[in-house]
Amino acid sequence: MTEQLADKKCVPCRGGVPPLKGEELEVLHKSVPQWSVVNQHHITRAFTFPDFKQALDFVNRVGALAEEQGHHPDILLAWGKAEITLWTHKIDGLTESDFIMAAKIDRLVG
């Protein structure tokens, strides 16, 4: 299912839709198991790299992907580490687009 999600395009949220909860959330989470669901509000994953440059290169690729998809994560960059957090700000919770973006980011690291 990760490949299927990674092939989809993020859809801009119109607002007024409820955030994902319960079974819907669990099913999507299974497609990106390396991501952690936090308080049914956001998903996060830490990536490690051998040095700062590789972490920075990864963050730049995530940034380009975010612009392409119109769905922008919070990104923490440190030496040898990048932490990505996703949620849909317009509804202050999770939508399918967050999981699509997570699957696309996973594809960047192989």
Regions found by a protein language model. Name each.
Residues 1-33, 38-56, 60-110:
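Long, contiguous binding/interaction regions
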